[in-house]
Amino acid sequence: MGNKQTKTDVILIGAGIMSATLGTLLKELAPEWDITVFERLEEAGVESSNEWNNAGTGHAALCELNYTVEKPDGSIDISKAIKINEQFYVSLQFWAYLVNSGVLRDPKEFIRPLPHMSFVQGEDNVAFLKKRYETMVNNPLFKGMEFSDDPKKLAEWIPLMMENRVVNEPIAATRIESGTDVNFGALTRKLFEHLKRKNVEIHYRHHVDDIKRTSDGLWELKVRDLDSGAVERHVAKFVFIGAGGGSLHLLQKSGIPEGRGIGGFPVSGLFMVCNNPDVVEQHHAKVYGKAKVGAPPMSVPHLDTRFINNQKMLLFGPFAGFSPKFLKNGSMLDLFTSVKPHNLLTMLAAGVKNMALTNYLIQQVMLSKEQRMEELREFVPTAKSEEWDVIVAGQRVQVIKDTEAGGKGTLQFGTEVVHAADGSIAALLGASPGASTAVHVMLEVITKCFPERMKEWEPKVREMIPSYGVSLMKNERLLHDVQAATAEMLGLREGLALQLV
């Protein structure tokens, strides 16, 4: 290893939406800090943040049925939906602040207003959706949501989905205008361009081989230049591991006790993309269905209008796949090398507990294109095989850990921050809702890792995010102000008009 050692205040590993967000927040809060970024690929936002590797849904729990559950007494628990919705507003406020301050220009390049819809078939599912609607519509966060079980109304909302549909059982949908389509790849690239202008050192094609604690409490990284093969040592006071599926291995290398006992289970995704512009033009919404019985939450099927490179697209999925890789550009040994003595029993327990998931993944992997088309035709009855192509999306690594509620080897489906007790290093693990809540999650990192600075930073945080520390649901006036301001700045007026009435 070379003797050259470079010292900096902050190192961010991975040039995805999480590091982009954290770097941008820190440059607002502590502009004098030196920040260095290492990314093993050739540019920012190539892995999970890339627009082709995620669904591009601004997750605000408007249409995702897995965020609202029916309780044993028949009532609908919307607490998770409220939490995710408020977290998405944190992202919207920060992005609006960045547009207002000139950091982000032309917001339509990364966010567009788009109706979010839930669509179900069958008597029980329709009853569930109606109860969900009745519970949510009275909450100020979900004002403007509509429900219909009238096929004629549904034909107005989703003509492509209703064309030639044989309706022989109850059918229903909810619709809310205030949804969004977010191009997280474009947003990530814009934020890294800004960080470069702010003198952040960004090293592409650089791989972090090792992380270790120095005797004086700093973190030393062994970093390899993938082009020249040169190895350097970089030392920092604070390290953030935002390497997507690569985060677990790096967390394990850090040796912090908080990272022990955690495992990861990789799931890949496939989408179908429509190649006929005439069909694409007939649909304008993100329409989420209900996961089949026994299927995992990330398998909820949805038919999405997307805007990629300013072009309107139509995607359907996801279909799950399995690869032992933790990253799309990872190694086939990733899963195997993540198993350590401290997480072996947890991983084995997860294997036993999740046989249904394993069977589901095997079935999904074995599907032919025509079998995938049959699933698509549940949404688009007129879909023609030659008009749809299969694309491979990104890899997600679901967290496996022991929990009080789930016991040993519980598979987690959320996003999780793991940090050292002294706040000197933090890692982001997990998947959904992921990028949509990036600002909330990175503020959580800052709060946990720099508690002594939060009093000093709080006024600036409130300037950027007026609802910081406040429940928007309980403060309707602030909610109204936030909706109006973010709609104005981000060009979302069309979608939010109904909520502002």
Curated annotation (Swiss-Prot):
Pathway assigned to this chain's UniProt record: Carbohydrate metabolism; tricarboxylic acid cycle; oxaloacetate from (S)-malate (quinone route): step 1/1
Reactions mediated catalytically: (S)-malate + a quinone = a quinol + oxaloacetate
GO function term, MF aspect, one: 2-hydroxyglutarate dehydrogenase activity
Gene Ontology BP terms: tricarboxylic acid cycle
SUPFAM superfamilies: FAD/NAD(P)-binding domain
EC numbers, comma separated: 1.1.5.4
HAMAP family, per database record: MQO
Name of the protein described by the UniProt record: Probable malate:quinone oxidoreductase
Gene label: mqo
